[in-house]
Amino acid sequence: MYNYLDFEKPVADLDGKILELKKIFQEKGSLDMSDEIARLEKRSQTALNDIYKKLTPWQKTQVARHPDRPHFMDYSKRLLSDVTPLAGDRKFAEDEAIQAGFARFKGEAVAYIGQEKGHDTQTRLRYNFGSARPEGYRKAVRIMEMADRFGLPLLTFIDTAGAYPGVSAEERGQAEAIAQSTAATLRLKVPVVSVVIGEGGSGGAIAIAAANKVYMLEHAIYSVISPEGAASILWRDPARAKDAAMNMRITAQDLYRLKIIDGIISEPLGGAHRGKEIAIDATGEIISEALKAMVGKDGEVLKQERREKYLQIGRSLA
């Protein structure tokens, strides 16, 4: 059984009936319920299709946050081989919210940086729900500089509600660490490809997303602040997050129209959590195509194109 979101109730009801019939069929094999089960399965798929054809920005936010959605470690296991993770920022500590190191992608050496949220209570606490501290961003800069030194393409996977806002993080220079990470990305003379696989929240996301090519999964979100945060600022009421999401242009479709991202990666019907391998493989193909298009490009050209890409966003929206 899936973890159904509130707006998926019609599908949940139909799937519940299907399970009941299958259970009866198993207990009383003499009853042939295959036709009824097939009819309900068709209705369930139709209902799911109807719902996902017209998701609101707030509903997409819920899908992007789905507890069963594939996270960075799922992508790493399927897309990367010979993984060699590095730990620590060489200044203070290790931050597991950001996973980073070197690996092979389709046989080619790459550097990678990924934000990991965790799948259960234990791993969510371990990874701090994907909210990195300054040490995580300083570790990311370490990897970026090494990738640049060795001429390795950099792949980044974004999935965070935002950088950790705690007092301890602020004391250790959270804002400076985010700024330095963003600046380091813009200085690189190697191809950089970023994919927003779930949430792309605020500076915590942009710190590793200033890439030559930026893609989003179909139901991912990317914004300067979470809908709850925006609602708290605008209306002093986080309960109005739904209203904020409607006005923030946070969906992949909105951001592609605004030319902030370079492409949208299709998800299986019902979201990436309903077909993890399909979603991850589709992401791998997009990354591969993006890297091939940048093979042989001069490092200074890559750096300048990346810089112009972000300057153009401000100009085009002015």
Swiss-Prot record:
The gene is accA. It is an enzyme of class 2 (transferase). Belongs to the AccA family. Disulfide bonds: none annotated. Component of the acetyl coenzyme A carboxylase (ACC) complex. First, biotin carboxylase catalyzes the carboxylation of biotin on its carrier protein (BCCP) and then the CO(2) group is transferred by the carboxyltransferase to acetyl-CoA to form malonyl-CoA. PROSITE patterns: COA_CT_CTER (PS50989). It catalyses: N(6)-carboxybiotinyl-L-lysyl-[protein] + acetyl-CoA = N(6)-biotinyl-L-lysyl-[protein] + malonyl-CoA. Gene3D superfamilies: 2-enoyl-CoA Hydratase, Chain A, domain 1. Acetyl-CoA carboxylase is a heterohexamer composed of biotin carboxyl carrier protein (AccB), biotin carboxylase (AccC) and two subunits each of ACCase subunit alpha (AccA) and ACCase subunit beta (AccD). One of its GO terms (biological process) is malonyl-CoA biosynthetic process. Its EC number is 2.1.3.15. Its main location: cytoplasm. InterPro entries: Acetyl_CoA_COase_a_su, ClpP/crotonase-like_dom_sf, COA_CT_C. One of its GO terms (molecular function) is ATP binding. The lineage of its organism: Bacteria, Pseudomonadati, Pseudomonadota, Alphaproteobacteria, Hyphomicrobiales. Signal peptide: none annotated. Pathway: Lipid metabolism; malonyl-CoA biosynthesis; malonyl-CoA from acetyl-CoA: step 1/1. SUPFAM superfamilies: ClpP/crotonase. It comes from the Bacteria. GO terms for cellular component: acetyl-CoA carboxylase complex. This is Acetyl-coenzyme A carboxylase carboxyl transferase subunit alpha. Keywords: ATP-binding, Cytoplasm, Fatty acid biosynthesis, Fatty acid metabolism, Lipid biosynthesis, Lipid metabolism, Nucleotide-binding, Transferase.
